[in-house]
């Protein structure tokens, strides 16, 4: 069921009712109902308005013992920001430190449907390289222009402490919430084009048009 189904699995893998998940503004609004359905609570870290990298001062204040997961979306919808290597490294360092302090793993859930949609040499680092306890949620809707096919996956970092258990739990969660496999024909088709994308240049063209128009209107924009 695409990244939506992947996120639904990830939230259930790592939380119980009453636990908290932190995410960063601005964010995809459907995160709220996805988390609400698990009984967990989504809390939103206010943005760094200068460049939309993580507001670490606010983040560390909100990272309490009740937090069981941190949800990031990079490249981000709707801001377009790509979290830099220094940002991800600092985030990972904080999560390791707080996991040790609180005596439980704080998982990092990385929502990555826009992973390939970066332009002008911008680096989009692989989140799981920075933090072992990462769960990655992906959709082919954007990279292959297949939004109606609902095809994606949830991947657990092999270095994650509970990787083996979590993979098995995903099957049980699928049965419990009705997110069964997409049709086999689209799974087989996507498997043949894992190293390819649709023509993404139209997105770059649209980006440049919007950027120019916003500047002409007097807005300050980060590109």
Give residue spans per PLM region:
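Conserved core of the PLP fold type I
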Residues: 1-103, 116-130
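Hydrophobic "anchor" residues on beta-strands that sit immediately upstream
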Residues: 69, 107-108, 135
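A structural motif corresponding to the C-terminal end of an alpha-helix
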Residues: 97-106, 213, 217
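Structural signal for conserved beta-strand scaffold positions within catalytic alpha/beta enzyme cores
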Residues: 44-46, 136-138, 223
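Conserved Walker B
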Residues: 112-114
């Amino acid at each position: 069921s695409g990244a939506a189904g992947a996120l639904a699995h990830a939230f259930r893998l790592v939380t119980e009712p009453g636990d908290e998940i932190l995410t960063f503004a601005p964010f995809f609004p459907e995160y709220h109902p996805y988390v609400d359905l698990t009984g967990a609570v989504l809390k939103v870290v206010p943005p760094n308005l200068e460049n939309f990298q993580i507001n670490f001062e606010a983040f560390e204040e909100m990272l309490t013992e009740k937090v069981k997961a941190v949800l990031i979306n990079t490249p981000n919808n709707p801001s377009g920001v790509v979290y830099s290597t220094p940002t991800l490294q600092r985030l990972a360092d904080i999560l390791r430190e707080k996991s040790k302090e609180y005596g439980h793993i704080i998982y990092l859930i990385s929502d990555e449907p826009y992973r390939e949609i970066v332009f002008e040499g911008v680096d989009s680092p692989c989140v799981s390289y920075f933090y072992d306890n990462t769960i990655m949620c992906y959709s082919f809707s954007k990279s292959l222009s297949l939004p109606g096919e609902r095809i994606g996956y949830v991947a657990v970092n092999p270095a994650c402490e509970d990787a083996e258990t979590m993979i098995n739990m995903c099957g049980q969660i699928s049965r419990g919430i009705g997110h069964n496999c997409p049709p086999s024909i689209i799974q087989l088709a996507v498997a043949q084009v894992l190293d390819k994308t649709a023509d993404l240049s139209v997105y770059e063209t649209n980006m440049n048009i919007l950027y120019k128009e916003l500047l002409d209107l007097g807005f300050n924009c980060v590109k």
